[in-house]
């Protein structure tokens, strides 16, 4: 949310033609993070003497591939809408890019943060898999709202609601993986992060590709990406059955 707000203020003040300057400013953050990490203690995920699962051992487990799929779909479900929210707001509401950025990505980010805040505060009282199931269903509904509701303002509300629905997907999948695969360790979390990043790039790419193939109809692009929350929902149900067995 801060990135969207600060970037919008910067472009409004100095003009979008100075985007390279803003890129350099934002580049300072990962540089500082790298310096901090150099001096930060990193503790092992295993008890002393324990050995985590190897990548080969992880790849031999069916549940690992299920959570990998879930992680990919979590990233794709989130970014398929958030990356196109500004364009959707501009085209649907016929507003400037400044207003589009505030109405689209910022509303999405606020509600996504709210979902994570609520779970962080009340997580001990909430069943994670049930919360993720309802969130996935809400995500599907928001996608359908974006694709089919003819009123631009309501479709934009669907974008914001989508932000709330995807808030738990990424951290929730990490938690499910940790509980389902004992001894997964660093290798597991690294591969899950890779899967999530692939989803973050694949979701918007699919939406954009489908949109351009049907006459730049962004609604149809978003509709095509509905496959991701549906697959995530299926993955959650598989994890539930696996836990019972």
Give the ranges of each region predicted by the language model.
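Structural signature of the two symmetry-related core transmembrane helices
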Residues: 130-145
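A late C-terminal transmembrane helix in Major Facilitator Superfamily
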Residues: 181-216
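Extracytoplasmic gate region of multi-pass secondary transporters
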Residues: 61-113
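Paired small-residue
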Residues: 142, 153-161
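Interfacial helix-cap and linker-helix signal at transmembrane-aqueous boundaries
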Residues: 5-16, 89-90, 122-123, 178, ...
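Intracellular juxtamembrane helix-capping segments at the cytosolic ends
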Residues: 167-181
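Helix-loop-helix hairpin linking two adjacent transmembrane segments in secondary transporters
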Residues: 1-42
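Multi-pass alpha-helical transporter architecture, strongest
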Residues: 34-41, 223-245
């Amino acid at each position: 949310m801060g990135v969207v707000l600060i970037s919008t203020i910067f472009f409004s003040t100095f003009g979008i033609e100075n985007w390279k300057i803003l890129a350099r400013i934002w580049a300072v953050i990962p540089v500082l993070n790298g310096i901090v990490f150099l001096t930060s203690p990193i503790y092992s995920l295993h008890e002393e003497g324990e050995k985590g699962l190897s990548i080969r051992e992880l790849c031999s487990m069916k549940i690992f591939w299920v959570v990998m799929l879930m992680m990919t779909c979590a990233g794709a479900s989130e970014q398929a809408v958030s990356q196109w929210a500004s364009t959707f707001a501009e085209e649907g509401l016929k507003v400037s890019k400044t207003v589009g950025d505030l109405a689209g990505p910022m509303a999405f980010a606020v509600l996504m943060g709210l979902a994570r805040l609520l779970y962080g505060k009340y997580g001990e009282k909430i069943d994670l898999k049930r919360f993720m199931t309802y969130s996935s269903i809400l995500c599907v509904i928001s996608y359908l709202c974006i694709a089919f509701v003819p009123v631009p303002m309501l479709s934009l509300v669907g974008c914001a609601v989508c932000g709330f629905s995807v808030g738990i997907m990424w951290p929730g999948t990490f938690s499910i993986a940790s509980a389902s695969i004992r001894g997964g360790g660093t290798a597991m979390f690294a591969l899950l992060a890779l899967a999530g990043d692939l989803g973050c790039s694949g979701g918007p790419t699919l939406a954009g590709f489908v949109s351009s193939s049907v006459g730049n109809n962004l609604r149809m692009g978003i509709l095509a990406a509905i496959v991701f929350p549906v697959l995530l929902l299926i993955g959650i149900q598989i994890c539930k059955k696996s836990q019972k067995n």
